[in-house]
Amino acid sequence: MKLLNNCIVAAVALLLCAAPSGDACTSIMVGKKASTDGSVMTAHCCDSYYRTFVTIEPRKTLSPGETEPYFFNVLHKEEPWDTRGVHETGRIVPPALQTYRFVNTAYPCMNEKQLAIGETTFDGNRDLLNRNGVFWIEELERLALQYCDNARDAIRLMGEMAEKYGYADWGECLTVADPNEVWQFEINGPGPGEPGAIWAAQRIPDDHVGISANISRIGAIDFNDPDHFMYCKDLKKKAKALGFYRKGRDKLDSTDGRKWKVYSKQHLQYLSYQRFQTIQTA
């Protein structure tokens, strides 16, 4: 028994060493026909060194012409009033003058309309990183929860605003759910030059369960299926410029990990373990 316990401790230690803190989050998506009571779900474990307090942000009424600030590093605050390391990245013209009430955590997670969001980082290709953008991923979530009441509108708004004002973070996945459906939204920076964003989203079928554990999960994007896929403006053009797309195809295949991130064998083993453990406990 002592030997077995030592082996378990050693295995856990190896797994902890194998993944950096930013690569230890797992998100789960459940369609309404895959749950026992018809509920749509998104669940998210945030395994890193982020803020632990929760606040309920009230509704706000903005004045015509008023702009809204967005920030860097709010997820590391120790208290609601803590501003150390936090700075404004830019201001946007809000899409509406009235906001919804929402639950604010390290990664804002749900609003009063039952729009819910989970998060997991997949890093992405370094060549796509562009720090000149306004939005970091947690602030993009805040934007959606403030102004949207369903998953599709949330994805459209996050995508359009990221393209317009710029996305500054690493490759990220957001699992976006409402009472009817759940989607997986993946976003990268546009590369060097002008701020922008490259993104796509795929709907999880109603009778399916999806798992995203720190690796890009959207494989082929079907441009002829708008009920299951959404994507950024000029995606084909951008993908072609990056060498990710071949002319004449109706699908963009992003399953080649070299396009988005070079994963080490050790890292891939850890990510596979995350997904395996999730399936085992389902």
Label each residue range with its predicted role.
Residues P20-A24:
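Sec/Tat signal peptide C-region and signal peptidase I cleavage site
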Residues C25-I137, L157-A282:
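A contiguous strand-loop segment
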Residues V9-A18:
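Bacterial N-terminal signal peptides
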Residues E141-Y147:
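Short, well-ordered beta-strand elements within core beta-sheets of diverse protein domains
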Residues M1-V9:
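Bacterial N-terminal signal peptides that target proteins for export
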